[in-house]
């Protein structure tokens, strides 16, 4: 139908970007005056980026994980996460000194953060994950299609 065609046409023509914009009171087209840097490649379709210690992290479908300097946009490392080549709808999260990324097919990649990030391990929850994990009270909460997992130290009584 026409609505479906419009959706797919718009998706094909989408011009997704990751960019840094200077804050201020400007109005109108700020491209020439307030955009510090811009990338049109390696841009995620759904997940939000994660900013941690001056490094902006993004994950793209196919398990492509990118670390760039937030101040300049310089890409420090962009590579596929072996064992976690998946579609990503949830956003990366930082907890317990690590980065966690949940893929649609249930793979959870655990990474050492930094400009030259390192894939530490991949865990398979064996069912879809669409939600971004949450961290609270020393635990990581991961929601799969049928279960909410609480991972971490047992609470003191």
Model-assigned labels for residue ranges:
Residues 1-157:
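Noncatalytic, solvent-exposed loop/strand surfaces
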